[in-house]
Design a protein with these regions (language model features):
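His-Asp phosphorelay/catalytic-motif detector in bacterial-type signaling
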Residues: 47-49, 76-81
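Short amphipathic alpha-helix used as the core "switch/output" element in two-component signaling
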Residues: 41, 63-78
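Conserved acidic carboxylate
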Residues: 10
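Alpha4 helix (beta4-alpha4-beta5 surface) of REC/receiver domains from two-component response regulators
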Residues: 62, 66, 89-106, 110, ...
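Short hydrophobic/Thr-rich beta-strand motif most characteristic of the beta2 strand and flanking loop
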Residues: 27-36, 42
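Active-site beta3 strand of CheY-like receiver
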Residues: 46-57
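Charged docking surfaces used in two-component/phosphorelay signaling
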Residues: 17-25
């Protein structure tokens, strides 16, 4: 059985490394990129089963909600489940994110990093 493939988009180097390492140790195949602006090139190279997207990117970067909207404009990308990572807590508009196809929202910091792996497996197509 092929492992679930994940595209992880996280700007914080340490967090990106920890999340990628945790998911890989659990048997998931992870491609990790630091900027949301790189997501479209990464998707053209191969479609993941799940996208894990940090909603809050640094100022001047493509923002998470904009990425979600663009993902839904391309037929090949529209059905890819997206797990949002957000330090914004209740500020995240859950109606908007659901409409944009978000499968799950996890708050940051994650106290139990294995929760990410469980969530990715649960939403994988």
């Amino acid at each position: 059985m092929a492992s679930t493939s994940v595209l992880l988009v996280e700007d914080d180097t340490a967090v990106r490394g920890l999340f990628a390492e945790t998911m890989e140790a659990a048997g998931l195949s992870v491609r990790a990129i630091p900027l949301a602006a790189h997501i479209f090139d990464a998707l053209r190279q191969g479609l993941p089963d799940v996208i894990v997207l940090d909603l809050g990117m640094p100022h001047g970067s493509l923002q998470g909600m904009e990425v979600l909207a663009r993902l839904r404009e391309v037929d090949a990308w529209r059905e890819i489940p997206v797990v949002i990572l957000s330090a914004f807590g209740d500020v995240v508009n859950r109606d908007v994110t659901r409409r944009l196809g978000v499968a799950s929202i996890l708050g940051k910091p994650l106290l139990d990093v294995s929760e990410l792996t469980r969530t990715v497996r649960a939403v994988a197509r």
